[in-house]
Amino acid sequence: MYSDIIRKQSDCYDSIKNFCTSESQLYPIKFYPQNEYYANKFGLDLNNLTQIDNNTISQKVLLEIAKIWANFIMDSEYPVFDRKTGKGFWNNVSFKKNNDNQLMVKILVVGQWIDKINSDYFDQLIELVYNKCRIDTHCIYLQYSQNKSSPDKQENIQLFAGSNGIQENILGINFWITPFTFSQANPNTCEMLYETLHQFINIDHDKRSIICYGRNVGHICLTLKSTKNVWAYNPCPVVDSDLKRTLTSNIISVNIQLFLDTKCELISDKLNLLDQYDKSNYLLIVSPGRNGLKNNVIQAIKQSRSIIKEFYYVSCYSKSLIRDLKNIENCHIEKAQAIDLFPSTEFCETIVKIVL
């Protein structure tokens, strides 16, 4: 296990060495000593049930629940959807569990469903899951498509049974989670990531106002304990809805403005319009997905470099980080912190401070 972690650290820091100087600080990788059966998510393709026994990442209780659901579906009067013939009903099912042993389930079916199942259809299954696993099925969502093509994330989905969403506590804040919102899959390292980011920046003692971008702006900013102004830009409509709900159900220290920014136009405008004569310094934090930053954000960072001067980048994919730094040009890494967020995978989370 530990040799894999050291190798991941070496690969991570080797990938960014061209942007480091002799004075760059590269800290030892942080990790949690559990590299199997840690993830609180599992998605099951009902055409490939071997996924259950072959999985060593998701929590064992989720794999047991997946078997119970698979048996129920295989014994039902409706067949699994066959992608070759285009016939069938059940397509896939996914699970997300919180630390309170509450379960969220999303089912994808194909074709007309109203005359087949109703909200009582899964009552016995819910009871069976509780009796065998002591897990409360808190909500079931149903999503349907008219053909073999999967629908968009927000398309044709509805709460089918139970309450709307589950909550996940991160650093004292209860975040609402529904299907397709942003959530961390590893409960062991989730708080480690955001605590480390806050310490890496020394954020509670930094007096600057924050400009933050990413689907995890809530995790980064709502968990701060100090009072400061925050402009938070998030590209996902589902995250936007759940974050607004989270705001109303928690006591938040920061003065935050949330913006839905699907094309990154708002954060680009914010950076482009920063006044060089404004004496209020700004702290910029970007946390893009695996595709990295959009070009308009990169151009805005380049234009505002005389004001921003430095920023923090939370990277989940080193190739995107490297590409973005090349495109930003004339920058270097002052310090970096690797975190093994998802053991036994190729991905390594890296927090970097970039000087322009």
Swiss-Prot record:
EC number assigned by the record: 2.1.1.-
Localization per Swiss-Prot or TrEMBL: Virion
EC top class, as a word: transferase
Disulfide cysteine pairs (residue numbers): none
Active-site residue list: 316
UniProt keyword list: Methyltransferase, S-adenosyl-L-methionine, Transferase, Virion
GO MF terms held by the record: RNA binding; RNA methyltransferase activity
List of residues binding S-adenosyl-L-methionine: 184
Gene Ontology cellular component annotations, sorted alphabetically: virion component
Swiss-Prot/TrEMBL GO biological process terms: methylation; RNA processing
Main location: virion
Family statement: Belongs to the class I-like SAM-binding methyltransferase superfamily. RNA M5U methyltransferase family.
Protein name: Putative RNA methyltransferase R407
Annotated source species: Acanthamoeba polyphaga mimivirus
